[in-house]
Amino acid sequence: MLVIFLGILGLLASQVSSQLVGQLRPTEDPPEEELEYWCAYMESCQFCWDCQDGTCINKIDGSAIYKNEYVKACLVSRWLDKCMYDLDKGIYHTMNCSQPWSWNPYKYFRKEWKKDEL
């Protein structure tokens, strides 16, 4: 019985730790431990990429793209269970942090980098 209880408690603890909690003031530089979360639902945010010499490497999965209109400066913030992306010029996205969904108005600008294209 104790083993079952501890197993359930461990399962609940792992679910709680994966959810974002607390307030996050608007920032272009979210905490490192939250980067995977924010980049999963709005991949074109500039903080998700390391860009140099016209090529950008994704900080989460290592994919490479050409730097263009796809990579945008983003402000992210969190208040209670609302996670928000602000892309400036009236483009923003709000979602429940506990029930996130992907959103990317710039997906058509993404151009994969290929090693043989120089």
From Swiss-Prot:
Protein keywords: Early protein, Glycoprotein, Host endoplasmic reticulum, Signal
Main localisation: host cell
Induction of the gene: Expressed in the early phase of the viral replicative cycle.
Localization per Swiss-Prot or TrEMBL: Host endoplasmic reticulum lumen
Positions of glycan attachment: 96
Motif (Prevents secretion from ER): 115-118
Processing after translation: N-glycosylated.
Top-level division of the source organism's lineage: Viruses
GO cellular component, one term: host cell endoplasmic reticulum lumen
Signal sequence, start to end: 1-18
Family: Belongs to the asfivirus MGF 110 family.
Entry function: Plays a role in virus cell tropism, and may be required for efficient virus replication in macrophages.
Protein name: Protein MGF 110-6L
Species whose genome carries this gene: African swine fever virus (strain Badajoz 1971 Vero-adapted) (Ba71V)
Organism phylogeny: Viruses, Varidnaviria, Bamfordvirae, Nucleocytoviricota, Pokkesviricetes
